[in-house]
């Protein structure tokens, strides 16, 4: 019987656009390598984590669901070893990562972070933006429409409105 029991939690398919197979393969390879070293590894979905089915004190994960991150953070606070910390994953959401990098003077493309339901045309014009990229602020790309190149401030406003209608609050 293995002395070390590890939970390996798969990333939800919604957060693996065009890469579901790749992400699953990565986690399976990690699990297999741990098993070769004598560990017992149980693979779970994010839904199973959220449902409370994970009891192991060591967790390797690829989670991205907001609720999953909250659970991972709680487990980490309670003394579990969480590889891919829920706190670290949360810091990799686009808006938070942008703020951290810019605030730490790490070179990063000039950025404006806005609410998708606000009028931004005048702000873009005064900042000198003409062509630019608009990216969802909450997560990295989940659909190809989550990253949009626009040619002028009016088009930027239209794209932000589309994001708002899709439930994306920040870009």
Residue ranges and their predicted role:
Residues 1-6, 54-56:
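A short, charged/proline- and glycine-enriched loop
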Residues 2, 8-10, 79, 87-170:
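Active-site nucleotide/adenylate-binding loops and adjacent lid/helix of ATP-dependent enzymes
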Residues 10-113:
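Conserved N-proximal alpha/beta basic substrate-recognition cap immediately N-terminal to
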Residues 43-44, 169-171:
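Short, charged N-terminal helix-start/capping segments
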């Amino acid at each position: 019987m293995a002395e070390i029991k590890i939970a390996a939690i798969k990333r939800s398919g919604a957060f693996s656009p065009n890469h579901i197979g790749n992400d699953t393969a990565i986690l399976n390879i990690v699990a297999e390598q741990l098993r070769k070293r004598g560990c017992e590894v149980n693979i779970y979905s994010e839904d199973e984590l959220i449902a409370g089915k994970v009891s192991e004190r060591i967790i390797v994960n690829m989670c991205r669901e907001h609720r999953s991150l909250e659970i991972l953070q709680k487990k980490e606070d309670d003394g579990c070893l969480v590889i891919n910390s829920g706190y670290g994953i949360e810091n990799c959401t686009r808006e938070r990562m942008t703020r951290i990098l810019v605030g730490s003077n790490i070179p990063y493309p000039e950025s404006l972070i806005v609410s998708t339901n606000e009028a931004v045309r005048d702000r873009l014009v005064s900042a000198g933006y003409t062509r630019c990229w608009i990216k969802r602020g909450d997560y990295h790309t989940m659909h190809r429409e989550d990253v949009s190149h626009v040619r002028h401030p009016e088009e930027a406003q239209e794209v932000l409105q589309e994001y708002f209608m899709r439930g994306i609050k920040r870009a």
